[in-house]
Amino acid sequence: MITLEQFKVGRSDYIDQHVIDLFRQDSMLLDRLVFDDAMIPGTGGTLAYKYMREEVPAEAQTRAINTEYTPQEASRKEYSADVKIFGGSYQIDRVIERESGIASEVAYQTEKKVKATCNLFHKTVIQGDSDTDTNSFDGLDKALRGSVTEINANGMIDLSSAAAVDENYKIVMDWIDETLSELCGRPAFIMANTSMINKMKSIARRAGYMTRSEDSFGRSVDGYDGIPFLDMKYYPTKEADGSYTEKPIIPIQTRAINNKEVAGLTDIYFPVIGRDSFHGVTVKGDSFIKQYLPDFTKPGAVQKGEVEMLAAIALKSTRGAAVLRNIKIR
């Protein structure tokens, strides 16, 4: 298992280290996630990581003299996560780079490409579905559907106004306690969209549960009872007319609740990071994160640069992550 910080230590090139830090700065998820880096590409160019997910735990019993235990077995099921290649390329004219001075165009484009890669990884961690997109792995929304850690799947909690927050914040706290009790450990984050994070801060302030810590770069991070909030932010979508709209990575949707359409519903995710719960996957060696800078010493007016990350996620136990469904925020 390796973290991005540990992966950075093994890189001797300063630019490589800087690009890795850009990923860590832009994504607290990537910064704190541990990755199994033992995956070796198979034949045929596959990057499949197979693992077992525990679905039914073992039970212990007491028995009377001259009686037998009732047989019961823990059960697990094989799953596969295909490591995906995230990244992108950009092109820069050598004149633009030469005249950009201290505000390097290469540095600017690299930083923006890292941010876009982090956004896509966040989106895939939540919304990924390998059945509908072969370039994706299965995200938490799909993995937790129908599991014991999918909480409030058929109910609804109203936080759509300040008055509703005043009335219902204790109910939300009870549901959070219920969710946390289903996990195999303490979650690393409370993952939600921006609007839901703001609602959670309101609840934490009302309850006296607002806490504050620092990330790896000394930046302040708010949390709920010591669990940091992780804003999964937005993902830009290109429309038919060429314009871009940004939509929350954890969506705000209209859903059917008790045979009635309810708008403004969203979810909160609680991942427990660890070898036997929820972790990342990458390949063995130095290909985890790579950058390829434009080489303006070569012929050609326009040179290309690229940023690339090889990653997937694995949920080793159904209690390694949880989702609290159907919170109305609009």
Stretch-by-stretch model annotation:
Residues 1-246, 254-330:
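Flexible, glycine/threonine- and acidic-rich loop/arm segments that mediate assembly and lattice contacts
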